[in-house]
């Protein structure tokens, strides 16, 4: 059993530890206050990203329209219609945000990529299960596929409007990819 002398030593040691903790917390708070702000994205890089993303989403809307025209699988066609509407909405939102930032949409998907995408999507010789399998093969990991969008959003603490627009678009993209993965599993086993 500890006597009063031992208890006093313990109390003194605990007091010293408590004081050291306070000093450490004070230093941490000072360091956090002095820390440089989180990495931000230069305006030109943001405008370029938004413009290219906008063009890609517009191509997505157009190519999904071509796919819907030749699709003969009801579950695919229904899902593609929803995805097409989201892609178009994203393109319009991104274009509007570009304009709000004082920029104009200028990026165009290279013609060869546009033509190949439209040809592949509208190919009636290729079945829906084949097209979906090809798409899923390009994006096997849903999280990895949307991470670049989230990485950009993480750099936009100074622009919460764009930051949260990108985060909600990423949620839509996750939904699209999950639909395509589920459809691939359903149709291809």
PLM features: residue spans?
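Non-heme di-metal
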Residues: 2-189
């Amino acid at each position: 059993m500890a006597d009063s002398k031992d208890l006093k030593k313990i109390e003194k040691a605990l007091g010293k530890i408590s004081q050291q903790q306070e000093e450490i917390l004070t230093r941490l708070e000072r360091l956090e206050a002095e820390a440089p702000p989180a990495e931000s994205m230069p305006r030109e890089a943001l405008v370029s990203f938004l413009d290219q993303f906008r063009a890609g989403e517009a191509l997505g809307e157009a190519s999904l329209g071509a796919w819907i025209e030749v699709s003969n699988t009801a579950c695919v066609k229904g899902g593609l219609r929803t995805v097409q509407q989201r892609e178009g909405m994203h393109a319009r939102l991104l274009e509007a945000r570009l304009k709000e930032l004082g920029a104009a949409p200028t990026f165009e998907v290279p013609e060869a990529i546009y033509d190949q995408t439209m040809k592949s999507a509208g190919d009636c010789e290729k079945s829906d299960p084949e097209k979906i399998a090809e798409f899923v093969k390009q994006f096997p990991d849903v999280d990895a596929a949307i991470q670049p969008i989230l990485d950009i959003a993480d750099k936009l603490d100074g622009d919460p409007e764009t930051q949260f627009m990108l985060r909600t678009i990423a949620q839509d993209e996750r939904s699209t990819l999950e639909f395509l993965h589920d459809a691939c599993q359903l149709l291809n086993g």
